[in-house]
């Protein structure tokens, strides 16, 4: 019986693509034939891992697998002893493209490889390092958390944030060099790549990876800038304005393109990811776009009805309490909730009414309550219903006895 693909990768069925990719990378490195020569068990594990990743990394295949199991992907995923390698050249390309994506953009040329394509790892060109652009290396994304009050979330807000990040070095204008000059890298001789031959289960391979000296650029700076040590970037403080729309929820995030860390030596900047964190509120509890407020009223107010000022996210409003309002009743104040994230309009404020029970009563107050207790109107209606039900069954018993 074929193993469950999620179990093969050691992830849950709700795992994200990043979690699946991370698990695949770890296992592929662990069981790779280069690290386990002449180990048949490792070879089989390697096949299983690739087969599982081929399916779970593809949205359509994963959906069919979740719905129908192995039968749903039988035509595209490999099966039996052939493992991941019975699926043809297209499936190989998917698998090794993922290898290329995760292992730094490396590519390999095989000698005598039986798969019908030359560049198995699909690196292409001379771009060895992932994230490398025509000028420099792309900057990394920067993630920050932004705490907001419920009032700010209800209406939307613009925040000015002061953050620390990598910025372009002003001394060298981001080139990393005092003069802006560069020279060919001596490690890779300007190619941006280093090569290493190895034998695998597929035959002779030449692994081509990014040069560790120049980061895949092929050139290094001359006369390094002393302010940034030749990187073209340095730590700095910047001010960023963030416009948060109404209706965001805890965990939502906003992506500000190009506002992340600057890229070394002229590389494109990364993105700034602002993760929303909702502060707990002293008075209100959020329920989607509605807010809930607990209101304690005296027993006479519940019985007789009243008008009372109730706090909202937008200030106090007058709320009418109808006579004979029962505890735990929910009264609605339209349009006093949170603005809709997509579309116009706002949610409502729900007021949950509870009775306030005093703890300390005077002798006179106790006597008054005792007198009220004797009246029929203050008897719970459930007791009367019980008596009526008992009377009905007694009558039924009399009829059929």
From Swiss-Prot:
Zinc finger residue extent: CR-type: 156-237
Co-factor binding comment: Binds 2 Zn(2+) ions per monomer.
Domain J residue range list: 4-69
Keyword Kinase: no
Annotated region (Disordered), positions in chain: 377-401
Residue ranges, compositional bias (Basic and acidic residues): 385-401
CXXCXGXG motif repeat placement: 169-176, 185-192, 211-218, 225-232
One BP annotation, GO: response to heat
Domain of life the protein comes from: Bacteria
GO CC entries: cytoplasm
GO function term, MF aspect, one: heat shock protein binding
Pfam families for the chain: DnaJ (PF00226), DnaJ_C (PF01556), DnaJ_CXXCXGXG (PF00684)
PROSITE patterns: DNAJ_1, DNAJ_2, ZF_CR
Ligand binding (Zn(2+) 2): 185, 188, 211, 214
Binding site for Zn(2+) 1: 169, 172, 225, 228
InterPro entries, sorted: DnaJ, DnaJ_C, DnaJ_domain, DnaJ_domain_CS, HSP40/DnaJ_pept-bd, HSP_DnaJ_Cys-rich_dom, HSP_DnaJ_Cys-rich_dom_sf, J_dom_sf
Cofactor(s) of this protein: Zn(2+)
UniProt free text on domains: The J domain is necessary and sufficient to stimulate DnaK ATPase activity. Zinc center 1 plays an important role in the autonomous, DnaK-independent chaperone activity of DnaJ. Zinc center 2 is essential for interaction with DnaK and for DnaJ activity.
Subunit: Homodimer.
Family indicated by similarity: Belongs to the DnaJ family.
Function, in words: Participates actively in the response to hyperosmotic and heat shock by preventing the aggregation of stress-denatured proteins and by disaggregating proteins, also in an autonomous, DnaK-independent fashion. Unfolded proteins bind initially to DnaJ; upon interaction with the DnaJ-bound protein, DnaK hydrolyzes its bound ATP, resulting in the formation of a stable complex. GrpE releases ADP from DnaK; ATP binding to DnaK triggers the release of the substrate protein, thus completing the reaction cycle.
PANTHER family, per database record: CHAPERONE PROTEIN DNAJ, DNAJ HOMOLOG 1, MITOCHONDRIAL-RELATED
Name of this chain's protein: Chaperone protein DnaJ
């Amino acid at each position: 019986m074929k193993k469950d693909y999620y179990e093969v990768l050691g992830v849950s069925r709700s795992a994200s693509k990043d979690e699946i990719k991370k698990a695949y990378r770890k296992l592929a490195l662990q069981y790779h034939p280069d690290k386990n020569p002449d180990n048949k068990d490792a070879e089989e594990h390697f096949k299983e891992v690739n087969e599982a990743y081929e399916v779970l990394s593809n949205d359509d295949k994963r959906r069919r697998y979740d719905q129908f199991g192995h039968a749903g992907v039988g035509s595209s995923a490999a099966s039996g002893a052939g493992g991941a390698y019975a699926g043809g050249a297209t499936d190989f390309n998917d698998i090794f493209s993922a290898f290329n994506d995760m292992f730094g953009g490396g590519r390999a040329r095989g000698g005598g490889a039986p798969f019908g394509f030359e560049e198995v790892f699909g690196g292409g060109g001379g771009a060895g390092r992932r994230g490398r652009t025509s000028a420099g290396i792309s900057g990394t994304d920067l993630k920050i958390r932004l705490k907001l009050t419920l009032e700010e979330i209800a209406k939307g807000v613009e925040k000015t944030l002061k953050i620390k990040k990598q910025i372009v070095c002003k001394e060298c204008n981001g080139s990393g060099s005092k003069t802006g000059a560069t020279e060919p890298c001596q490690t890779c001789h300007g190619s941006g790549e280093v090569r290493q031959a190895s034998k695998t289960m597929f035959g002779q391979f030449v692994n081509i990876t990014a040069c560790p000296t120049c980061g895949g650029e092929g050139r290094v700076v001359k006369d390094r800038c002393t302010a940034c040590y030749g990187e073209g970037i340095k730590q700095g403080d910047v001010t960023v304005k963030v416009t948060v729309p109404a209706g965001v929820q805890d965990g939502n995030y906003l992506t500000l393109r190009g506002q992340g860390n600057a890229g070394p030596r002229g590389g494109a900047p990364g993105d700034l990811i602002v993760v929303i964190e909702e502060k707990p509120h002293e008075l209100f509890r959020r329920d989607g776009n509605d807010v809930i407020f607990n209101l304690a009223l005296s027993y006479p107010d519940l019985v007789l009805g009243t008008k009372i000022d109730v706090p909202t996210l937008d200030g106090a409003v007058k709320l009418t309490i109808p006579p004979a309002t029962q505890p735990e009743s929910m009264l609605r104040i339209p349009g006093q909730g949170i603005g809709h994230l997509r579309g116009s309009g706002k949610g409502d404020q729900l007021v949950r009414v509870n009775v306030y029970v005093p703890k300390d009563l005077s002798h006179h107050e106790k006597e008054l309550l005792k007198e009220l207790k004797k009246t029929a109107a203050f008897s719970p209606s459930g007791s009367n219903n019980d008596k009526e039900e008992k009377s009905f069954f007694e009558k039924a018993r009399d009829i059929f006895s």
